[in-house]
C-alpha cells in the first residue's frame, strides 16, 4: 500500500493542510514509525539528491542524455512497467471501487524525509523558497502524484522528455539502493 498511501492520503493531506499535517494526523504508534523512517531516510535521500544536483549543475547529466540518445538505435529505451510491482499497480488502478488506505507512518516518514531533503538542498544552494515550494512540493502533490495515481508511473514517465525518462531509470535504482542499504 506504499504507492497508494503516497498518491492518495499523503498527497491530499499535504495539498490540503501542509507538510506538518501528515505527521499530526497519525496516531502515536504511526508517529513513532514516521520518526524512525524519517530519521533513517533523510541522509541517504539527501546524498542521492546532492549527486543528482551536482550531475545537473556540472553538465554531466546533459552529456549522459546525449550519449544515451546516441545508443538508442542499438539499445532503445523500454517501458518501465514490465516488473511485477508495476503490474500490481495496473490491477489496483483498474479497480474503480478502490478506497485509499490510511496514511502509513513508515511510508510517510520516508516520503517526507526525501521531500524535505530536496527542500533543504535547494535552500542550501540558494534557490528562492517560492520556487522550491512550487516545484518540489506543490507540483508533486497536486500534479504528479494524482496523475501517477490515475495513469501509473510508466505512463507519466514515458510521456515526459528524454531527459526525464532517462533520469527516472537512472536514479530510481540509486534511491532504492541507498534507502534499502543505508536506512534499513
What is the role of each PLM region?
Residues 1:
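Rossmann-fold NAD(P) dinucleotide-binding segment
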Residues 6-99, 106-184:
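NAD(P)-dependent Rossmann-like dehydrogenase/reductase catalytic/cofactor-binding core
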